[in-house]
């Protein structure tokens, strides 16, 4: 029961021992986040709300919670993928092509509507360990060169603001110095450009709101990469916190 799919609603639920992670495909074909938190047994209760414009000052792409936002359209938030095509275009517009399940892995298939370019979003569920692994595979099916300017593994949505971000920093002889930082409006960026593991920043995030050793919610994630990486933690004007990790 690690992967539960409601095909009628186009909703996908990743169920681990104590947690649920739910997303789906909306009326515009966007992969949208619905829930991440304590386990909900009956995932059929989830519906994909129709995406409607709040006002002309709030574009659809600003208010929607995308699992994998790409560069283009009226997206002013951080994007996971940016590419340059042979004709100079840098805008991606994807369509949903379907899904595959192989054991504990769910693959969401996306395709650009203008170029022969595929993106597959991979989700692996490790039920006993309460872990979800995410990554993306990108394929250029044409004979033309496509330059990838940026790629992150995915975006996480945390339904709170004013969180505390924890990580470690350091230098030679003083590694692993723990620090905390209040997340406010704007972005926190952690990165490494050295090409190897470094003591300056570590590729993970821990976010909480007044959590203790025994109480409270803690959201965390780590990038399975020891070389160049980048991470962004962003608090939006809509009362949530976004997190991305990926290759720098």
Residue ranges and their predicted role:
Residues 24-27:
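Contiguous, structured surface segment used for ligand recognition
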Residues 5, 10-13, 17, 21, ...:
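Polysaccharide-binding surfaces and accessory modules of carbohydrate-active proteins
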